[in-house]
Amino acid sequence: MALRGTLRPLKVRRRREMLPQQVGFVCAVLALVCCASGLFGSLGHKTASASKRVLPDTWRNRKLMAPVNGTQTAKNCTDPAIHEFPTDLFSNKERQHGAVLLHILGALYMFYALAIVCDDFFVPSLEKICERLHLSEDVAGATFMAAGSSTPELFASVIGVFITHGDVGVGTIVGSAVFNILCIIGVCGLFAGQVVRLTWWAVCRDSVYYTISVIVLIVFIYDEQIVWWEGLVLIILYVFYILIMKYNVKMQAFFTVKQKSIANGNPVNSELEAGNDFYDGSYDDPSVPLLGQVKEKPQYGKNPVVMVDEIMSSSPPKFTFPEAGLRIMITNKFGPRTRLRMASRIIINERQRLINSANGVSSKPLQNGRHENIENGNVPVENPEDPQQNQEQQPPPQPPPPEPEPVEADFLSPFSVPEARGDKVKWVFTWPLIFLLCVTIPNCSKPRWEKFFMVTFITATLWIAVFSYIMVWLVTIIGYTLGIPDVIMGITFLAAGTSVPDCMASLIVARQGLGDMAVSNTIGSNVFDILVGLGVPWGLQTMVVNYGSTVKINSRGLVYSVVLLLGSVALTVLGIHLNKWRLDRKLGVYVLVLYAIFLCFSIMIEFNVFTFVNLPMCREDD
């Protein structure tokens, strides 16, 4: 999820400043997983022990996404993925006595390295590519910008298919998807500092397509194997999603134009019809509000663009005779020219009323002591023969809104030492990483390196692949040392580590008043994770590396997690709808509770608490 324009430098700078919060959150997730593994591990071991008598008939060796070679035999434990990586410098006993802390610090360092590469090098190069290809904002956001935020998950999935042959990659995809939907929305709702009005079209569009993608994924993994055409279908589905984003404006106009227009009485649908407690459909007829009840009107701030027709339809006042006359003259009983003039007059009056309300002025005193207001039906009449009176009746000119301060470009540099003491400590720890990246990757954000954006793209991609490999390696060692299965480490620790930077960026964007964009983009980026993050590795394995082969899937444990993912999407959209499409603290607490429930159920399923699902991981005394 990346933003263009002047907000991106501010977002990147703030993300660097929030490094302690990110590290603290990831460590808290790891501590929660360790406690849960100790709590549910014994229960799951008993369930697995009681099920050993049926293992030869019901169990195939747990090698998620591993190519079928016909030589697998039934075993009483699952081979750990740690053997697919280079040998660690420490033994298992040394790690259990404290050396694992070094691996945790290394994994956190890789999380930060991935965030730096994506924010300061990879995403700017993608923006330059989009500019050269003349892509629209929607298409660029659905393709290159989505790739910029989901590249760590994609490489984790590739490593899971071609190196570990385990479930750490798909666990990261599923866990990151749930984290993006629940945690990002929850954090924005709790800490945005304002109530964010969500656009129903963007949320419903991405949620419906994402639901379709998850259902297709469940159907494909149900038979415990992936063939070449199934990976191809996932990629084709993403191509269709790009087309939807390309024609997003036309589709939105088609689905929203269903309700009666104020101007001509033709069917037009307002976005406020779905999810607005003020709208009941009775105000489509201009004559209805004449005898209706005046509802409590929400307060509207002074915005650059005010949707006057939607505001009037959502909270119509009780009109008296002068305004009622204007409303009647915009019906189809009058000619088009009269309707246009009266509609323009209503819009001008309503705009003036909103400006006065925003400035705390609800009425204007006249010379004879009366007050002039739309609410009491006194519409001002201009007298061209008395310019002095017209000048006195005109409202004072409004001061122009202050222009936003320009955001200075904050280029990453190893030689800019911060002034604060805490920032200096962080600068010392991150200096080797920043120096290495600045020396090896040209920063195409700078004017002199702008023409080398393709070199930036290639080198940044290589560094992302290297950091992702080290990250998955360290997380695999941590999980093996603590006795946590790879899929749980992927769903929790890896998902949080790769998604917390995006969560912090979404919070920053929400505080800037763009919370709707942040929330809708989180769901849209999950479409990339499922369709591309899984479709591309599966397609490469079955069509390029080994044509005609299949990818083995442990659907017994994976289907449960994907069903939980599907349920979390449905419950989140339902909660947003019941909350009148508003993102506030109440909705934030609701989705965070859903995330905690998802983690608990996923961990209990993987530890065989409810029923036997997975074999325990093979342990070695080294």
Curated annotation (Swiss-Prot):
Q: Where is the composition biased (Pro residues)?
A: 394-404
Recorded catalytic activity of this chain's protein: Ca(2+)(out) + K(+)(out) + 4 Na(+)(in) = Ca(2+)(in) + K(+)(in) + 4 Na(+)(out)
Q: List the disulfide bonds.
A: none
Q: Where is the signal peptide?
A: 1-38
Which portions of the chain have biased composition (kind: Low complexity)?
Answer: 380-393
Q: Which PANTHER family match?
A: SODIUM/POTASSIUM/CALCIUM EXCHANGER, SODIUM_POTASSIUM_CALCIUM EXCHANGER 4
* Membrane topology term: Multi-pass membrane protein
**Spans within the Extracellular topological domain:** 39-97, 164-172, 222-224, 479, 548-557, 608-622
Would you say which domain of life the source belongs to? Eukaryota
Classification via Pfam families: Na_Ca_ex
Query: What are the UniProt keywords, alphabetically?
Result: Amelogenesis imperfecta, Antiport, Calcium, Calcium transport, Cell membrane, Cytoplasm, Disease variant, Glycoprotein, Ion transport, Membrane, Olfaction, Potassium, Potassium transport, Repeat, Sensory transduction, Signal, Sodium, Sodium transport, Symport, Transmembrane, Transmembrane helix, Transport
What is known about what this protein does? Calcium, potassium:sodium antiporter that transports 1 Ca(2+) and 1 K(+) in exchange for 4 Na(+). Controls the rapid response termination and proper regulation of adaptation in olfactory sensory neurons (OSNs) which subsequently influences how odor information is encoded and perceived. May play a role in calcium transport during amelogenesis.
- Tissue specificity statement from the Swiss-Prot or TrEMBL entry: Expressed abundantly in all regions of the brain, aorta, lung and thymus. Expressed at lower levels in the stomach and intestine.
**Where are the coiled-coil regions?**
none
Outcome reported for the amino acid change (mutating L436R): In AI2A5; uncertain significance
* Stated family: Belongs to the Ca(2+):cation antiporter (CaCA) (TC 2.A.19) family. SLC24A subfamily.
Q: Where is this region: Disordered?
A: 358-410
Q: Where is this gene product found? A: Cell membrane; Cytoplasm
Look up the record and name the associated disease.
Answer: Amelogenesis imperfecta, hypomaturation type, 2A5: A defect of enamel formation. The disorder involves both primary and secondary dentitions. The teeth have a shiny agar jelly appearance and the enamel is softer than normal. Brown pigment is present in middle layers of enamel.
- Protein name (Swiss-Prot/TrEMBL): Sodium/potassium/calcium exchanger 4
Q: What is the effect of changing S499C?
A: In AI2A5; autosomal recessive
Bilayer-crossing residues are 98-118, 143-163, 173-193, 201-221, 225-245, 458-478, 480-500, 527-547, 558-578, 587-607
Origin species, per record, is: Homo sapiens
Recorded GO MF terms: calcium channel activity; calcium, potassium:sodium antiporter activity; calcium-dependent protein binding; calmodulin binding; symporter activity
Q: Alpha- repeat boundaries?
A: 139-179, 495-526
Provide the residues annotated with a glycan attachment (glycosylation): N69, N76
